[in-house]
C-alpha cells in the first residue's frame, strides 16, 4: 500500500475514487432499453443469448427448480442463510417508521401515515461470484415494509440455471418471483414490463457498469435506491488498534473487485507500517491474490496524520461506504463522524459481519454518496403520506395566515376555498 503523510498531500486528489465512466456505455444501454421496451421477451432472450451465452425458453424460475435447489444445497449453508435472514429481519423491523399526529393549533390536526409501495425489483449480480447475501439484503427489507410483489432478476449460468444458493436465499427472503435475466436487459424488463416480467415501481441492488447505466436511464420512470460503484473501506485507527485485524479488513475489501478502494487513516506511524507489513504477508497467501494486488495498486493508501482530528476530517471528506473505527474510545470518535454508509466499532467488528449477518444492510452508497444517502433500508420501500383534519374553528384561525399569502401569490381560488367554507 502507498504510505502518505497528510501534511504533504493534496487531499482531494488523494481520496479521488477510481471511477467507472457510466456515460461511455449510455448509448449501448439506451439501445438495449428501447429494444426491450418494444420487443419485450424476445429482446430479453436475444440479449441473454448474446451476453450470457445461453438460450432461455422459460424466463421465470419454477417451483420445481426451487425445490430442487433445496435438495442439493449444502446443509450448513442452508442453516447459515436462515440465521442471516433472521438477523436481517430483526434489524429491519426496527426501521419501520411510526404513524403519528399532532395538534398544530386548536382545531388543526396534522400527521403522517405509513404505506408500502406496491412492487419492487431486486437485481442480484452474477459475474465473478454468486451473492445469495445480496438477495437477503434487498428482498427482506421490501417484504418487511409490506411490498406485495417482490421480483428478483439474476443472470443464468451457462447451463441455463440459477445457482442453488441464489434460489434458496430468494425463497427464504420471501421473493414472489425470480427471473433468469441479468444486465441492462433485466433492468429494462423491470422498468417497462414484458410478457413474462412484471413492471415494478422501484429497482434496487448492485450491478456492473451496464446495470448502473440502465438504472440511471430508467430513473424517473421507476425509482432506484442510489448510484452504486466499486466497493470501499476506510479504517480510522490509533495506536491501540491491532494491525493484523486491520490488514484482514483491507484484504476483505480488496478481494471484491480490482476497482475497490482501501484506506487506512491513522495518527500512528508505527501502526501504519505494521499494518502494511501484514497486508503484504496476507496477500501472498490469499486465494484471490491477483484481484487484491490490482485493487491495492490502484486504490490502496495509508494516510498518516499528525492528530486524530485530522484523521477524522479525512474520514468525513472521504465519506466511505464502510468505516471501521478502532481507537481508544470508539464512541467518542463516532460522535465526530457525519459521513459513512455503515460503521463498524472496535476490534471485533469486521466489515464482513455487516456483509453477511449482523443485521444491518450491505447495500450502501459508494463514491462519496454517504454525504447524501443512507444505505438501503425498510424505509426505502415505504411512502409517508401526510394527513390533516381541520374543524371550522381551526380553518377560521388558519385563514388569517393562509388567505393573505394566497392572494399575494395570485391564487385567488385558493383563498376562496377558505372564504366559501367560512360564510
Identify the residue ranges that each predicted region occupies.
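Conserved NAD(P)+-binding/catalytic subdomain of aldehyde/semialdehyde dehydrogenases
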Residues: 174-245, 249-252, 256-261
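Short acidic-hydrophobic, aromatic-tinged amphipathic segments that line or gate anion-handling sites
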Residues: 1-7, 177-182, 302-307
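Alpha-helix C-terminal capping segments
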Residues: 137-148, 171-173, 191-197, 215-217, ...
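C-terminal core of ALDH-fold dehydrogenases
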Residues: 317-423
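Short loop-to-beta-strand entry elements in the cores of soluble alpha/beta enzymes
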Residues: 204-206, 226-237, 253-276, 292-303, ...
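N-terminal Rossmann-like NAD(P)+-binding subdomain of aldehyde/semialdehyde dehydrogenases
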Residues: 1-118
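Conserved small-residue-rich beta-alpha loop and adjacent elements
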Residues: 102-168
Amino acid at each position: 500500500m502507498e504510505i502518505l503523510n497528510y501534511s504533504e498531500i493534496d487531499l482531494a486528489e488523494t481520496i479521488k475514487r477510481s471511477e467507472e465512466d457510466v456515460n461511455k456505455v449510455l448509448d449501448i444501454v439506451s439501445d438495449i432499453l428501447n429494444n426491450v421496451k418494444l420487443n419485450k421477451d424476445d429482446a430479453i432472450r436475444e440479449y441473454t443469448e448474446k451476453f450470457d451465452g445461453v438460450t432461455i425458453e422459460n424466463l421465470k424460475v419454477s417451483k420445481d427448480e426451487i425445490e430442487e435447489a433445496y435438495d442439493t444445497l449444502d446443509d450448513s449453508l442452508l442453516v447459515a442463510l436462515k440465521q442471516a435472514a433472521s438477523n436481517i429481519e430483526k434489524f429491519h423491523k426496527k426501521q419501520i417508521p411510526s404513524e403519528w399526529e399532532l395538534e398544530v393549533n386548536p382545531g388543526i390536526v396534522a400527521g403522517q401515515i405509513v404505506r408500502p409501495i406496491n412492487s419492487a425489483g431486486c437485481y442480484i449480480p452474477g459475474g465473478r461470484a454468486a451473492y445469495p447475501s445480496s438477495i437477503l439484503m434487498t428482498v427482506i427489507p421490501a417484504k418487511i415494509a409490506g411490498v406485495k410483489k417482490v421480483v428478483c432478476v439474476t443472470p443464468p449460468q451457462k447451463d441455463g440455471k440459477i445457482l442453488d444458493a441464489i434460489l434458496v436465499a430468494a425463497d427464504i427472503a420471501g421473493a414472489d418471483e425470480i427471473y433468469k435475466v441479468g444486465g441492462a436487459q433485466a433492468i429494462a424488463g423491470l422498468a417497462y414490463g414484458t410478457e413474462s416480467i412484471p413492471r415494478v415501481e422501484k429497482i434496487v441492488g448492485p450491478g456492473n457498469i451496464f446495470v448502473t447505466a440502465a438504472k440511471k436511464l430508467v430513473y424517473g420512470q421507476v425509482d432506484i435506491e442510489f448510484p452504486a460503484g466499486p466497493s470501499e473501506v476506510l479504517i480510522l485507527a490509533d495506536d491501540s488498534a491491532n494491525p493484523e485485524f486491520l490488514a484482514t479488513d483491507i484484504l476483505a475489501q480488496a478481494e471484491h473487485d480490482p476497482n475497490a478502494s482501501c484506506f487506512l487513516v491513522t495518527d500512528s506511524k508505527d501502526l501504519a507500517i505494521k499494518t502494511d507489513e501484514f497486508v503484504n504477508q496476507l496477500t501472498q497467501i490469499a486465494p484471490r491474490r491477483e484481484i487484491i494486488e490490482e485493487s491495492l495498486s490502484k486504490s490502496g493508501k495509508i494516510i498518516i496524520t499528525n492528530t486524530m482530528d485530522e484523521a477524522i476530517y479525512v474520514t468525513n471528506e472521504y465519506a466511505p461506504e464502510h468505516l471501521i473505527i478502532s481507537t481508544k474510545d470508539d464512541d467518542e470518535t463516532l460522535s465526530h463522524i457525519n459521513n459513512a454508509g455503515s460503521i463498524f466499532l472496535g476490534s471485533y467488528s469486521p466489515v464482513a459481519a455487516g456483509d453477511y449477518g449482523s443485521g444491518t444492510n450491505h447495500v450502501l452508497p459508494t463514491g462519496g454518496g454517504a454525504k447524501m444517502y443512507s444505505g438501503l433500508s425498510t424505509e426505502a420501500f415505504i411512502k409517508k403520506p401526510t394527513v390533516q383534519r381541520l374543524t371550522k374553528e381551526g380553518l377560521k384561525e388558519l385563514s388569517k395566515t393562509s388567505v393573505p399569502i394566497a392572494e399575494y401569490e395570485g391564487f385567488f381560488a385558493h383563498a376562496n376555498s377558505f372564504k366559501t367554507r367560512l360564510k
